[in-house]
UniProtKB/Swiss-Prot annotation:
Organism, as annotated: Streptococcus pneumoniae (strain Taiwan19F-14)
Protein name, as recorded: Phosphoribosylformylglycinamidine cyclo-ligase
Gene3D superfamilies, sorted: PurM-like C-terminal domain (3.90.650.10), PurM-like, N-terminal domain (3.30.1330.10)
Any matching Pfam family: AIRS
Superkingdom: Bacteria
Keywords: ATP-binding, Cytoplasm, Ligase, Nucleotide-binding, Purine biosynthesis
Protein localization: Cytoplasm
């Protein structure tokens, strides 16, 4: 018996691994940008920082996964957008610190290497990288029979970006009186899915609920996370933004205070929040307390900006999309987030 056959008998298909690498090369090629060095398949991805033109570069990194949204991708056998979710969760975090994404690495672990399915996953990662302007310079596909079921896989990513030292966004510039601007989310993004799956546990996904405006439930649940990089980078370059909050797990309550000092608070006008239909459906069918919704979900706002009043119109002009004035920064009395 050869070593190859012995490994195959243990459940690891080396040939399938080689096939995945060949399948994903064309997707990775879409993401190439200035600064990328070397070819796919090396022991480490390389990037030439001098190509960015940044005078005082500060590297900013982020890592994340997509949580149990993956379980719905597996359930509905739809794998071509979950990679975008993974990229979005990482790059939206680093853009909140003022970083331009440079490169991305992914990690996929599975019980059985199915090249066609994994190609779809990585194609989604590549699409996310294109939207973020980041190069996919490396990754790992691990086949682990016994650790995962044959149909199961997990996905994680790691993003690295760069910022001018003078343009880092760390919350220190946010002051009382700043206007809070909300940028629309595409849906649930990639948070709260353990609760979402419980609420819709008895649904097939084919249902068209009256609240969802003609869309199938599974389409809404797997809507890919919006990537805000190209919208927000011009604002950072012009130094128009004092603070940025990526609204992820923990909703408004946990994430908004991360962009300002402890002596400040965010006062939110709930009537200005563009609540999406899926959140109304979740509140109704899950019998979730209304105030708790803001502690879990983005409620239709995926990114929040703190902007000086005199810069609001210029920010709106550059964004060229619906921008929601949802509140302001005030002196903290009790709570860090006040929703009225």
């Amino acid at each position: 018996m050869t070593n190859k056959n012995a490994y195959a008998q243990s459940g690891v298909d080396v040939e399938a691994g080689y096939e995945v690498v060949e399948r994903i090369k064309k997707h990775v090629a879409r993401t190439e940008r200035a600064g990328v060095m070397g070819a796919l398949g090396g022991f480490g991805g390389m990037f030439d920082l001098s190509k960015t033109g940044v005078k005082e570069p500060v590297l900013i990194s982020g890592t994340d996964g997509v949580g149990t949204k993956l379980m719905l991708a597996i359930k509905y056998d739809k794998h071509d957008t979950i990679g975008q979710d993974c990229v979005a969760m990482c790059v939206n975090d680093i853009i909140a610190a003022g970083a331009e994404p440079l490169y991305f690495l992914d990690y996929v672990a599975t019980g059985k290497n199915e090249p066609a399915k994994l190609e779809q996953v990585v194609a989604g990662v590549a699409e996310g990288c294109v939207q973020a302007g980041a190069a996919l310079i490396g990754g790992e596909t691990a086949e682990m029979p016994g650790m995962y079921g044959e149909d199961d896989y997990d996905l994680a990513g790691f993003a690295v970006g760069v910022a001018e030292k003078s343009q880092i966004i760390d919350g220190s510039k946010v002051v009382e009186g700043d206007v809070l601007l909300g940028l629309a989310s595409s849906g649930l993004h990639s948070n709260g899915y353990s609760l979402v799956r419980r609420v819709f546990a008895d649904y097939t996904g084919e249902e068209v609920l009256p609240e969802l405006e003609g869309k199938k439930l599974k389409e809404v649940l797997l809507e890919p996370t919006r990537i805000y990089v190209k919208a927000v980078l011009p604002l950072i370059k012009e130094e128009l933004v004092n603070g940025i909050a990526h609204i992820t797990g923990g909703g408004f309550i946990e994430n908004v205070p991360r962009m300002f000092a402890d002596d400040l608070a965010a006062e939110i006008d709930e009537s200005k929040v563009p609540v999406l239909p899926i959140f109304k459906a979740l509140e109704k069918y899950g019998q979730i307390k209304h105030e708790e919704m803001f502690e879990i979900f983005n409620m239709g706002v995926g990114l929040m900006l703190a902007v000086s009043p005199e810069n609001v119109e210029r920010v709106k002009e550059l964004l060229d999309e619906a921008v929601y004035e949802i509140g302001r920064i005030v002196k903290k009395e009790n709570e860090s987030v006040i929703i009225k």
